[in-house]
């Protein structure tokens, strides 16, 4: 947290929190969310990596570096440290501390004896976040999801059949069902297929009705640009 009196209406433009190791360790990095991870060394890092970043200290010690409780604050990425073997934080944009409530996200270091334990310890990240503020959560129904990629009526129904046969709760329509996701002119209140992704046709109301008859839920993705 920032002292409100000392940092009144300030803007944070940079951060260089360092995480240093005693030697040049093996690490696994990706440069984007949902990207593929690749193996490299701390000394060979290039550009900014997304978090979490995993570092192998030795055969019995693995470290994951990341952040939690990210609210109204710039996302942290990790780049090669300016000194020693390690990484340091870099912000993806400026931070208005008044908007952020004079609070920063957690920067965490998770340690485990093997990589699988890092995944098992994911409750650690959950507990660093504020408790749920939604009083009635009965409408939230977690479940497995499969993405529909053809953006056609026929392909969607086939995907729904597969989901129903394999007890998959949801079918997801990702980018492209209402136009090009990065185009601010794309209207998420319409079904307008992005021609770069599919030739269609996609009758989404008909697909949703069919999914309901099969007991399968439908999720639709909307880029934040269409919500502004």
Q: What would you call each of these model-derived segments?
A:
Residues 1-132:
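N-terminal accessory beta-strand-rich subdomains and adjacent acidic, glycine-rich linkers
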Residues 7-9, 94-98, 134, 156-159, ...:
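Short, flexible coil/linker segments at or flanking structured domains
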Residues 28-33, 138-142, 176-180:
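Short C-terminal domain-edge/linker segments immediately following a structured domain
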Residues 83-85, 138, 186, 193:
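Amphipathic, alpha-helical segments enriched in basic
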Residues 86-94, 126-146, 197-207:
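Short, charge-rich amphipathic segments
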Residues 99-170, 174:
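An acidic-aromatic substrate-binding cleft motif
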Residues 146-228:
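Aromatic-lined carbohydrate-binding/catalytic grooves of carbohydrate-active enzymes
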């Amino acid at each position: 947290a920032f002292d409100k009196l000392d940092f009144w209406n300030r803007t944070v433009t940079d951060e260089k929190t360092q995480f240093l190791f005693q030697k040049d360790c093996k690490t696994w990095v990706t440069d984007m969310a949902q990207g593929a991870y690749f193996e490299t060394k701390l000394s060979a890092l290039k550009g900014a990596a997304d978090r979490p970043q995993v570092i192998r200290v030795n055969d019995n010690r693995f470290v994951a570096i990341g952040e939690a409780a990210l609210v109204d604050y710039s996302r942290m990425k990790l780049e090669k440290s300016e000194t020693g073997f390690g990484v340091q934080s870099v912000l993806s944009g400026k931070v208005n501390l008044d908007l952020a409530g004079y609070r920063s996200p957690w920067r965490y270091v998770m340690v485990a004896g093997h990589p699988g334990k890092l995944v098992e310890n994911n409750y650690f990240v959950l507990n660093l976040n504020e408790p749920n503020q939604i009083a009635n959560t009965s409408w939230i129904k977690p479940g497995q999801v499969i993405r529909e990629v053809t953006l056609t009526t026929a392909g969607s129904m086939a995907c729904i059949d597969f989901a129903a046969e394999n007890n998959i709760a949801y079918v997801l329509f990702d980018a492209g069902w209402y136009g090009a996701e990065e185009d601010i002119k794309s209207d998420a209140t319409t079904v307008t297929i992005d021609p770069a992704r599919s030739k269609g046709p996609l009758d989404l109301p008909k697909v949703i009705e069919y999914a309901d008859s099969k007991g399968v839920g439908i999720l639709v993705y909307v880029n934040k640009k269409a919500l502004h």
